[in-house]
Regions:
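Alpha-helical promoter-recognition and RNA polymerase-docking modules of transcription initiation factors
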Residues: 1-87
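Internal acidic/polar
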Residues: 89-96
Length: 96
């Protein structure tokens, strides 16, 4: 069963968990730097993922914060991976 949060409840939960974004970014600052990601862009991507994480949260499957952190880490890894692939393709074109 999915959650039945109203939009105002969802927004309140998101606002109270914005600190999770900063925590994930701090834990992964080396990855963000290595992938040459803009921190403002990363924050925005993770904020969107936070909203989706709250909307997709199923209370029967575990703790909300664990779900949020897992979703944020997954999004950051996906973003970094995409950036590295794009950077590699750019370098290959530039070398040709």
């Amino acid at each position: 069963m999915k959650n039945n949060f109203t939009i105002s409840q969802r927004n309140a939960i998101v606002e109270s968990h914005l600190w999770c974004i900063k925590a994930v970014m701090k834990q992964n600052r080396a990855l963000i730097r290595a992938a040459k990601l803009d921190t403002d862009d990363v924050y925005q991507e993770l904020a969107l993922r936070l909203i989706r994480a709250v909307m997709s949260y199923d209370p029967e499957k575990g703790d909300l914060e664990q779900h949020i952190f897992a979703q944020l880490r997954m999004e950051l890894q996906k973003t970094a991976h995409s950036s590295v692939i794009s950077l590699g393709a750019y370098r290959m074109r530039a070398a040709a």
